[in-house]
Amino acid sequence: MLTKPKPNSKFSILFTFLLLLSFLIFVARSSDVAVEAGSEEELDDLEQLLAVDEQLQEERPEQQSEAETVSKAQRIVVELNGDNTKRLIDGNEYVMVLGYAPWCARSAELMPRFAEAATDLKEIGSSVLMAKIDGERYSKVASQLEIKGFPTLLLFVNGTSQSYTGGFSSEEIVIWVQKKTGASTIKLDTVDEASGFLKKHHTFILGLFEKSEDSSGHDEFVKAASLDNEIQFVETSSIDVAKLLFPNLKTNNVFVGLVKTEAEKYTSYDGPCQAEKIVEFLNSNKFPLVTKLTESNTVRVYSSPVKLQVMVFSKTDDFESLAQPLEDIARKFKSKLMLIYIDISNENLAMPFLTLFGIEDAKKTVVAAFDNNLNSKYLLESDPSPSNIEEFCFGLAHGTVSAYYKSQPIPDNQNASVVAVVGRTFDEVVLRSSENVLLEVHTPWCINCEALSKQVEKLSQHFKGFENLVFARIDASANEHPKLTVDDYPTILLYKTGEKENPLKLSTKSSAKDMAVLINKELKWKDQSGKDEL
């Protein structure tokens, strides 16, 4: 969840919205208690203030508004500055820091969740100090903390920082912090405790061990809990507690099961009680059958151990008819691939992916896939019906779908001195051609490409009449081919007859005359560099 340290002027409308949002946040924060917290006494004062606040709320609970609840939560979070940061981090065993910027929309989204997490941690007796710092106002301090973008979450343990790797809901923040600073599991002994737990936790993994300390599987369950940073692990020795948490429970023996809020709410684990196997089960089942991509869960989705990900880009209304069929498809290919829904009207999420396929103007449903192990992408080019999507997934799971390479439409090159090559014609024009091919690889945003293109035009005129030499160019931003791997632009490649697999890279800093000399030398032609065209 990182954004650049400065807003992008290209998105002026979005920036105006962010400024308005930042102003509203500033107004909300203006009522916060200013806390220096430079010493234990200052933190004690904060605790006393919160205690008074809680007493007042108990006396008038019906008058407590949502704004007051948020205000209270925000007061629990200490504001760091240039004077108190070092003292607080060095003086506390655990400090969770949120680095934010007033103009950052994602910071604005995260701050109330962070404050809510701080409230929950306080209520369960956590010793973690929750703090935030305006990284733009205190840029030097933020830099010293190694805050490089916004928002950034860091946990300091005895003054040493570690990056945050959890989710971005308040519940996920609490789970991650607890696992890093306290017990990796929660023990529930009574039905009342379980009822209270269910009010705050919606996704968790349950372990039933009749005699927790003596169970052979208990240690493995606890070990699995420490290996996972996202899901809350709950253990109990009470059958009644277990049945309240997992109504589908069918055994009184050792049991492990996952509870979620989505379809497949209750999933039993039937493998051996080994930490690695439990985590593997969790990774295969913790996401919904069809995951909706949001800005807050992108990191979790991209880091999923299921690396073959099928993405359905669709408008909300159009997706409704696909939702149930997609869940059925997901069940068939669970652990082999992951199905993800992206609202095609959300440009921030959809556009980067659609651009990779050269279909950024798409308005109707698009089904695509990425294999992050093979670094390859795929596109369903037929109608995105449920049956076609299932066939597409079957082919992906069995490795029978060809990778997709984007291409512009095939151009009309009649009478062109420099032939335009696209992804679909690269084989025909460049690789399978019996002629030598000098290929200019460019992009629209390349600064030096225009000057080089003029040189290539001159060279094409200079060698006009040489039937065994073709001059060509390809826009690498809109066309791809597995045999075309270029890292910088512009690039000039000479594909010699009989040696097409190993093209010669020419210096783009050479003059047209020098290039002509090199071409003559490589093709063993009589030097033509003295002709007037150069």
Swiss-Prot record:
Gene3D superfamilies: Glutaredoxin
Prevents secretion from ER (motif): residue ranges: 531-534
GO molecular function terms attached to this record: protein disulfide isomerase activity
Glycosylation sites per record: 158, 415
Residues at the active site: 104, 446, 449
Thioredoxin domain mapped to chain residues: 56-182, 407-524
Subcellular location: Endoplasmic reticulum lumen
Tissue distribution of the protein: Widely expressed.
Role played: Acts as a protein-folding catalyst that interacts with nascent polypeptides to catalyze the formation, isomerization, and reduction or oxidation of disulfide bonds.
Name the UniProt record assigns to this protein: Protein disulfide isomerase-like 1-6
Organism: Arabidopsis thaliana
